[in-house]
Regions:
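C-terminal and inter-domain tail/linker signature
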Residues: 1-128
Length: 128
């Protein structure tokens, strides 16, 4: 497994982790202190905000899981990962692409692209 494949596996595992304590541990392990995440509907700066976006997405898309839609690849500290959001074993309802900027094997920035862009917001705190 390449370093980028392992990074992608851990990235998706953090989005799928339902337990807030375990999810936070994954975020702290995977992301740099000054990390940022953006997609068409949210911008999050710092690990607290990134973890809250993940929690909010889980509340808004209950029963769906993030899974890879191919192998991750990359070069020069930048990786890309095609992924899907779907019911376990079912067809994808959203497909996406994560462009991951890394620093010492950790995530520094992730730029997400979604198709289709959901009508709901994943702004931190939404869906509570």
């Amino acid at each position: 497994m390449s370093g980028f494949d392992e990074l992608a596996r851990r990235y998706l595992a953090s989005w799928n982790e339902r337990d807030p304590v375990r999810r936070r541990a994954l975020v702290d392990e995977l992301w740099t202190d000054d990390a940022g995440y953006v997609d068409p509907i949210v911008a999050a700066e710092g690990r607290d905000a990134i973890e809250e976006v993940m929690a909010t997405a889980q509340r808004q898309f209950p029963g769906l899981v993030y899974r890879p839609a191919g192998k991750a690849d990359g070069h020069h500290d930048v990786a890309r990962l095609a992924w899907e959001l779907a019911p376990d074993g079912g067809p994808a309802v959203i497909v996406g692409l994560a462009v991951m900027v890394t620093e010492r094997s950790r995530l520094r920035r992730v730029h997400g692209f979604l198709d289709p862009v959901p009508a709901v917001t994943t702004s931190p705190g939404a869906g509570r």
